[in-house]
Amino acid sequence: MAPSQLPAIFNPTSQDIEQLLAAQCHLGSKNLQVHMEPYLWKTRPDGINVINIGKTWEKIVLAARIIAAIDNPADICVISARPYGQRAVLKFAAHTGAVAIAGRFTPGNFTNYITRSFKEPRLIIVTDPRTDAQAIKEASYVNIPVIALCDTDSPTEFVDVAIPTNNKGRHSIGLVWWMLAREVLRLRGSIASREAEWDTMVDLYFYRDPEAEENKDAIEEAKAPGADEVGAAAVDQGFAGTGDWEVSGATAGAFTAASNTAAAGGASWDAAEPSDWAATPAAAGQEWAASGATEQW
């Protein structure tokens, strides 16, 4: 890493450098744009251009100082048409008070004052100059400064401050936005000191696929306790739970005994039925005969 041109208070810690390397912020593309040559460290044998992490940190601090110099945070617009940066810009806007445009940038946001989405920001920050080219083009029409996360092959036309980093990976994009938000909060005084840790985890800025999260939840529900015993595992184990079947057999025996008792009860009803019904008509016939004789007399 090249010697830093920043005051000692802005020097990165070893943890910051480790995070940048772990998120692969130093890995660029195989193509190199001429204006990104000052940020190049070296080129690997496989053709990948390696970015100087020291330059990345210097530009993060410079961009944070520019952002902190704007009095009204709502005058800052953060933009990301790339899906990997949409969650990051939304979290950055929530923590710093900026206005986020996540997704497609509507043409005319900065130039057509008739539209409802018309904005007049004092500064815009984009995730990728290539995918956010429309926003940068309109900002150049109305003289809005632009801060951009630039890879080695990113066009730097109309970009005022380029933060050299890998702007194609979900972890690298999230980490740079997280570090930028942390530096802004430190300069504003929201974080007590530079030695104090920010309580917001960097994972909050990482992109998450909604479908993958739903599939993950479904898999966790399928792995509920006891689910394996009635699934394929039970077949592999040869239905080891024969004790349950024996208990069921005992229960079936109880049902058999109950049915035998019911059959015995049916036999007693059959035996009692003819005697009772045979005796009743006879008695009834005698009574009617007696009453008829009485009426005749």
From Swiss-Prot:
Region entry Disordered, spans: 266-297
Key words of the record: Cytoplasm, Ribonucleoprotein, Ribosomal protein
One GO-annotated biological process of the protein: cytoplasmic translation
InterPro entries: Ribosomal_uS2, Ribosomal_uS2_C, Ribosomal_uS2_CS, Ribosomal_uS2_euk, Ribosomal_uS2_euk/arc, Ribosomal_uS2_flav_dom_sf
Compositional bias of kind Low complexity: 282-297
Primary localization: cytoplasm
Subcellular location: Cytoplasm
Functional note: Required for the assembly and/or stability of the 40S ribosomal subunit. Required for the processing of the 20S rRNA-precursor to mature 18S rRNA in a late step of the maturation of 40S ribosomal subunits.
Binding partners and assembly: Component of the small ribosomal subunit. Mature ribosomes consist of a small (40S) and a large (60S) subunit. The 40S subunit contains about 33 different proteins and 1 molecule of RNA (18S). The 60S subunit contains about 49 different proteins and 3 molecules of RNA (25S, 5.8S and 5S). Interacts with rps21.
Name the UniProt record assigns to this protein: Small ribosomal subunit protein uS2
Gene name of the record: rps0
